[in-house]
Design a protein with these regions (language model features):
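N-terminal mature-domain region immediately after signal-peptide cleavage
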Residues: 1-164
């Protein structure tokens, strides 16, 4: 297995961060869109246009609650040269595939008092489709205020799992 691609992002605005992300992960983002096109063609009676419409229905809520994330999403789409609709499908795939839903992930913590080294361990597995593995990236983001974030996600998705 290859190492995951690391995307380094440092910009002053969420849109500029998104553009950098989209440009650096363009091929993986486009491959991810194709993974979901094939997946939904096999598992859904809905057309790709209908699936895009479903994903886009989340846009008003995202704009109201997290406008900076939406700004970044537009940047990712522009940087990867894909439509915002395709990017929204990537980011809403959980919601789109929710019913019927099979379990995906397990999260656990081991507290210091339970270990001989008095160390805290955080564990998370990601039980999902093998087809997405080649499109997983590590994001290393440095925000304008100096906040640094490191995380793992499917290319094109806003950060999934991470630390800051």
């Amino acid at each position: 297995m290859e190492a995951f691609q690391t995307i380094h992002i440092k910009a002053d605005t969420p849109y500029a961060c998104g553009v950098q992300y989209g440009q650096q992960a363009k091929e993986k983002i486009r491959a991810g869109v194709e993974v979901y096109r094939r997946y939904f063609a096999k598992t859904s009676d809905k057309s790709w246009d209908k699936i895009q419409q479903y994903a886009m229905a989340y846009l008003p809520d995202i704009e109201q609650m997290m406008p900076e994330v939406l700004e970044e999403a537009y940047g990712v789409a522009d940087g990867a040269e894909i439509s915002i609709e395709d990017l929204m499908v990537l980011n809403c795939r959980y919601e789109i595939t929710k019913f019927p839903k099979t379990p995906e992930c397990t999260t656990a913590a081991i507290l210091p008092e339970a270990t001989t080294s008095h160390t805290t361990y955080l564990v998370k597995n990601w039980d999902y489709k093998q087809a997405v593995i080649p499109n997983i990236v590590i994001l290393h983001i440095e925000q304008a205020d100096g906040t640094r974030i490191l995380g793992l996600t499917e290319a094109g998705q806003m950060l999934r799992e991470g630390f800051n």
